[in-house]
Amino acid sequence: MKPQDLSPPFLWKERRPCIQDGVLYVPRHYFEHQNFSTSYHQEFFQNHTSIACELCSGNGDWVVAQAQKDPQVLWIAVEQRFDRVRKIWSKMINHQIQNLRIVCGTAETFFQYYVPDQFLQRLVVNFPDPWPKMRHRKHRLLQPSFVQEISRSLQDSAVFALATDDKTYLLESIEALQTHLAPRMETPYYIKMTDTYGNSWFENLWRTKGQEIFYTEFIKKAGI
């Protein structure tokens, strides 16, 4: 299957949450998510108990490789751009990957309305947009309110991981994450990654440009 074989499920003016062709669509500027989110869970996750999630999945190379590596874990790929969702979907279909689900929408909307408490065993954010200009920083993913959502969604002892090429973004994210999660690494709580992180398109892009890759992990402590 080619990416363009995945058709949009609705026109913008008719937007609504739906599951179609293995993709959960959670549109922005829609105000009745709660009416759908109570019923989708069984259809989409089918009683899987070991669940991991990647945010900012891009073209899907990394998450597809993870799903192939461990078929006992259900992976969720969250990506807001439909052109990229199409590419993830095409890889999922062509490789016949049964343990991968795709969410087309923002991470914030998906977590607020569709992710239950203590649901995830692992959450990975790969190369999120750092929004480097000061006036744009309100658009960053790892805002304090979303870090709280992350903590809520993780099981006790679950791991959160972040990979980025932007050191300023890394350090500010570490500060935000410490309000709800505990670092797994010693000070300064991150490492520089010299080896390939896992065939991410963005990782390959930044390495070809000579960028350093930074990686950090946090853990959800019991009772938080």
Swiss-Prot record:
GO molecular function terms listed in the Swiss-Prot or TrEMBL record: tRNA (guanine(46)-N7)-methyltransferase activity
Active site: 129
EC numbers, comma separated: 2.1.1.33
InterPro entries noted in UniProt: SAM-dependent_MTases_sf, tRNA_(Gua-N-7)_MeTrfase_Trmb, tRNA_methyltr_TrmB_bact
Annotated residues for binding of S-adenosyl-L-methionine: 54, 79, 129
Residue ranges that the Swiss-Prot or TrEMBL entry lists as coiled coil: none
GO cellular component terms listed in the entry, alphabetical order: tRNA methyltransferase complex
Catalytic activity: guanosine(46) in tRNA + S-adenosyl-L-methionine = N(7)-methylguanosine(46) in tRNA + S-adenosyl-L-homocysteine
Alphabetical UniProt keywords: Methyltransferase, S-adenosyl-L-methionine, Transferase, tRNA processing
Pathway participation: tRNA modification; N(7)-methylguanine-tRNA biosynthesis
Leading EC class: transferase
Pfam family, one: Methyltransf_4
Binding site for substrate: 133, 165
Family: Belongs to the class I-like SAM-binding methyltransferase superfamily. TrmB family.
Function: Catalyzes the formation of N(7)-methylguanine at position 46 (m7G46) in tRNA.
Protein name: tRNA (guanine-N(7)-)-methyltransferase
Provenance organism: Chlamydia pneumoniae
